[in-house]
């Protein structure tokens, strides 16, 4: 029966994109294979549930995972110190690394990595640090610091798998707060592509998501989000949806991909003004809107 259950479950999860699935036959009532190996299941050679939970690598570290750091706080106690505080979402950073601040695109070099226990030469995912830079760059809370040459996706329109958690349905067109890491913006569901039957994983047509529904939703937000797909980076691929009136979290989302955006057609005045600003005020860091 155990082998039949394994086979049935593997078939069910084929479409769920799981990298690693483990099975443990156990009895919660009798404690079999929960903490100690069960004498009643000599045919099972694997680990107990507790041993598996203590040894499994939930999020394996990868030396090549891109560095992502969302600024949570700008620390400026005096004119001689300006640091950007936050928790490293993924990857690692070294003193001397060249970074890019988003959305401005300005570059600098990491001068110091400051922690409560002293300065470091290197910091890794999950560590709370303050970064100081060689150059004075205007970076605010919610903006992102990444390494040069390894940029995230940037968009105002994206598709996400959404878990809806409120009694009031998710309605396309209704404005919500979208919290992506430390960045808060506003946005709305443009359309609901489908929702899932959680028992069969069948995609069903739907114009709304009710409480406990899971669905594929296209979003439009008012400010550019810098992200990696959730399957590649949970730290920058997740967001929460907050009701603007009650401030209650009503949903959670996992970004799958950016949507194709229509090329913005700028007027002659906008093009000329952009050229003038970049020519005469380069220190403003204005981007070339023709690219």
Predicted features along the sequence, with ranges:
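C-terminal effector modules of nucleic-acid-centric enzymes and ribosome-associated factors
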Residues: 1, 11, 137-291
């Amino acid at each position: 029966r155990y082998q039949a259950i394994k086979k049935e479950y593997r078939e069910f999860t084929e479409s769920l994109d799981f990298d690693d699935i483990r099975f443990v036959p156990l009895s919660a009532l009798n404690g079999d294979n929960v903490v100690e190996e069960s004498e009643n299941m000599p045919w099972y050679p694997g680990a107990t549930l507790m041993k598996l939970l203590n040894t499994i690598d939930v999020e394996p570290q990868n030396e090549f995972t891109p560095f992502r750091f969302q600024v949570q706080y700008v620390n400026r106690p005096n004119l001689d110190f300006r640091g950007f505080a936050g928790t490293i979402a993924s990857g690692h950073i070294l003193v001397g690394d060249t970074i890019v601040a988003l959305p401005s695109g300005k570059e600098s070099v990491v001068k110091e990595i400051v922690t409560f226990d002293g300065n470091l030469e290197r910091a890794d995912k999950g560590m709370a640090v303050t970064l100081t830079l060689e150059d004075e760059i205007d970076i605010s809370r919610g903006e992102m610091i990444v390494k040069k040459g390894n940029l995230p996706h940037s968009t105002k329109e994206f598709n996400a798998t959404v878990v809806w958690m409120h009694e009031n349905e998710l309605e396309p067109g209704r404005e919500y707060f979208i919290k992506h890491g430390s960045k808060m913006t506003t946005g709305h569901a443009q359309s609901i592509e489908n929702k899932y039957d959680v028992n069969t994983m069948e995609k069903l047509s739907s114009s709304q998501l009710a409480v406990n529904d899971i669905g594929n939703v296209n979003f439009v937000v008012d400010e550019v989000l810098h992200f990696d797909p959730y399957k590649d980076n949970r730290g920058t691929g997740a967001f929460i949806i907050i009701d603007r009136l009650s401030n209650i979290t009503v949903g959670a989302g996992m970004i799958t991909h950016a949507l194709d955006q229509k090329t913005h057609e700028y007027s002659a005045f906008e093009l000329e003004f952009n050229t003038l600003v970049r020519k005469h005020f380069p220190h403003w860091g204005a981007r070339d809107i023709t690219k």
